[in-house]
Amino acid sequence: LVGDSLTQRGYDSKKGWVSKLASSYVRRADVINRGYSGYNTRWVLDLMKRKPKLFVKKPTLVVVFLGANDAAVNHKREYAVPLEEYVKNMREILNLYKNVPRIVITPPPIIEKDRVQHAMETTAFDTPDRLYQHTEKYAVAAEKVAREMGVGVADAFDTFEKLGGGDLSAYFSDGLHFSEKGEEVVYALIVETIKHTYPWIASEKLSLDAPLH
């Protein structure tokens, strides 16, 4: 799993999407979390080139979940990556695993009012550091890259949009990071995407690493 804080935090509790995924694959495959909080595609790509030993050379599956920081604005502009560069970086990251099953998770929607509240509570600013429509551009671009490269897509942006009923706050802890309810949505989405795109990698299709006793 290659990503930012949305992936890193997936191990924060037993109900995190990464924790649940690892549990579903126990004794069948190791789920390796390479989520780097605060990282964008530029910094992740640089890390993959400078420290390749951090990343498995021939994994069974690669999941790339990046874009939330690339789409940063206002007082978090230092994290921002222009859309054209984001597309280029995503292609390059995916091309590092050309002969491996790959899935792209799109960045999820942003709850701007909750990001404003978060900024007011944690910084001297009263503006959001992410914007809904701006992040949507990165989600659309991520999906397009995946489709063009023939890899799987887990469209988190669209999935949350269909669930929210106009208010998505319950799925996020601060308008950006997932609540337990949001973690469950991402877990269900990635499991369904694996089953649909690469069914032979679904946990129930993999053999146990040793006999049962």
Language model: regions and residue ranges:
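Catalytic nucleophile-elbow at a beta strand-turn-alpha helix junction centered on a G-D-S/GDSL motif
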Residues: 1-12, 39, 71
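Conserved donor-binding loops in enzymes that form glycosidic bonds
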Residues: 4, 36, 176
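Short glycine-centered, acidic/aromatic-flanked micro-motifs in structured strand/loop junctions
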Residues: 3-4, 33, 66
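Short beta->alpha junction loops
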Residues: 33-40
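Alpha-helical cap/lid subdomain in secreted, periplasmic
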Residues: 15, 19-30, 43-213
